[in-house]
Structures are given as C-alpha cells and as structure tokens.
C-alpha cells in the first residue's frame, strides 16, 4: 500500500487504477482464513449476524459466559445496528463510516486480532492505522462506499424482486419510467433554440453537482471523526469524481478547478474542519483556530 501526496490531480484517474480494489468480502475471508471468528452477516459484512447480540460481543467477560469453546485467536463484529440507515447514508453521501470491534480472551490475543485486521484492511486498500487509540478502544473505523459491499443494490432494494403487474402499470417502481411519444420534426431554428436551452440546463446541472460534492464532503468530514489519512483518502475520491465531470464549458471548467482547489485545502493535514477551510481562505485568525482545532 502506498500513499501519494502533492500530486497533480489530473493524473488521479490513472493512478487509481493501480490501487487495490476494495471489497469488504476479501477482508473478512482472509480474517477467517487466519482463524479469526466472524459474527457478521455475510451478505453485507456491515451488520452482525441475526443470532449475534452486540451487548454480549462488545464485552469480554460477558462473551466468555456464553461462549464455551476455547478461543484460538479472537473474533470480529460491527457496532452498526441499522443496515438501512448505513445504505441510505451511502446513497446520499456516496460513502459512510463504519465501526468494527474485535476481542479475545486475553489482551495479547486481542492485540494480535487488531493488528491482523489493520494489516488486511491496508492490503485491500482501506485507510486505517494501528494506534494506541485503536488498541485501547478495540475499535477500527473505515470509510466505505457501495462498491465495498457485496450485492449492495440487491440488499438495499429487495422490492425489485417482488414486482407485480399492478406495480408495473401504476409505475410504483422508481426505476421504471414511461416512454414519451416521439416528437414531430421541428424547424432548424427551433432545434437551435432547444440546443442552447439544453446546453444551459447541462451547465447548471454540472455546476449544481460540483456544489453538492463540495458541500457534502465538508459536511461528511465535520460529522465523522476521521483520521487525517481518511480525510485525505475521502477528499481524493471526491476530487476524482469532480475530475470525471466531462465539459467544454469554460464556466464549468473554472468552477471545477476552484472546487478541486477547495477540497485539496480540506485534505491538508492542518485543516481538520470546514471552519479551518473558511478561515484559511479568508486569512482570518487561522493560526489561533488551528491550535484549538488540533
């Protein structure tokens, strides 16, 4: 695993092709192969199995009361209890933070589980570190998106498997749209006017999309307790999304460049919240705020 810093973001799309493909399934398969027990739902790896009790899993003494077999290594579980809330956050924010816990019957064995977990996550492209905070809390946080979850769309939209004729005709399914009749041919001038209108609409849509990406990125960082590496990774992904917006419009190009620069500032190690960014841009009381923020 390598981290690229101070890179011209025009080349991010190329470099991202050489990074490991992230998929939670790969992480937990390897954990299982190393002898670590998993109390996770294998359809998503983002919630515990139906028969697992979080209150028992997160406490060593409580767990050992119910688990009679000797623990060879240890076990892993998640603190997430609402899979649909997690899916919704991914749909709205393009990603989400999920917390996993780990334990064993001794501190040394628990540390081995944690180190193995971090190592495998890093190998599969997830940004996290083995720190004293992780060791003390026995909690590992990672940023995920829909590509990390097996069968994400299937899990989130089970109603797609149960459509009836009434659903189809009443257009209850949001993925099904009625096809309008083909319009009559129009004059050349009318077509030109329509093209200009479409160009303006397209411009506004792209400007709105860029604004939405910037606002959601800053809000997401403010809302979640992320490490500096995770902030850098998340901002980099959003910059890749911005760079993928294809346009020849000069206004859109300028706005895209400005938005990318803003997100580059957010991902700087010294900028930890949206207020940091605002003060940095305004050059007002920046140093004092940074001392408090850090």
Curated annotation (Swiss-Prot):
InterPro entries per record: BAG_dom_sf, BAG_domain
Single Gene Ontology MF annotation: protein-folding chaperone binding
Signal peptide span: none
Region (Disordered): 181-204
A Pfam family annotated for this UniProt entry: BAG
Bias-annotated ranges (Basic and acidic residues): 190-204
Domain of life: Viruses
Family named by the database record: Belongs to the IIV-6 391R family.
Protein name (Swiss-Prot/TrEMBL): Uncharacterized protein 391R
UniProt organism field: Invertebrate iridescent virus 6
């Amino acid at each position: 695993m390598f981290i690229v810093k101070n890179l011209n973001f025009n080349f991010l799309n190329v470099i991202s092709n050489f990074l490991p493909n992230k998929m939670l399934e790969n992480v937990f398969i390897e954990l299982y192969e190393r002898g670590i027990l998993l109390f996770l739902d294998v359809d998503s790896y983002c919630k515990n199995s139906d028969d697992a009790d979080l209150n028992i899993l997160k406490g060593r003494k409580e767990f050992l009361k119910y688990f009679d077999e000797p623990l060879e290594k240890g076990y892993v579980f998640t603190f997430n209890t609402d899979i649909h809330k997690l899916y919704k956050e991914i749909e709205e924010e393009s990603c989400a933070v999920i917390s996993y816990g780990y334990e064993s019957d001794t501190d040394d064995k628990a540390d081995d589980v944690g180190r193995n977990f971090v190592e495998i996550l890093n190998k599969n492209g997830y940004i996290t570190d083995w720190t004293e905070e992780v060791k003390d809390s026995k909690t590992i946080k990672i940023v995920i998106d829909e590509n990390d979850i097996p069968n994400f769309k299937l899990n989130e939209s089970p109603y797609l498997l149960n459509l009836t004729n009434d659903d189809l005709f009443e257009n209850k399914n949001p993925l099904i749209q009625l096809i309008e009749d083909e319009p009559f041919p129009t004059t050349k001038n009318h077509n030109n006017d329509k093209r200009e209108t479409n160009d303006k609409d397209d411009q506004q849509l792209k400007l709105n999309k860029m604004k939405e990406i910037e606002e959601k990125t800053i809000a997401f960082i403010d809302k979640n307790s992320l490490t500096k590496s995770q902030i850098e990774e998340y901002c980099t992904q959003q910059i890749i999304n911005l760079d993928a917006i294809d346009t020849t419009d000069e206004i859109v190009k300028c706005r895209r460049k400005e938005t990318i620069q803003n997100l580059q500032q957010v991902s700087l190690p010294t900028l930890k919240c949206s207020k940091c960014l605002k003060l940095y841009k305004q050059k007002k009381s920046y140093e004092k705020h940074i001392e408090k923020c850090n």
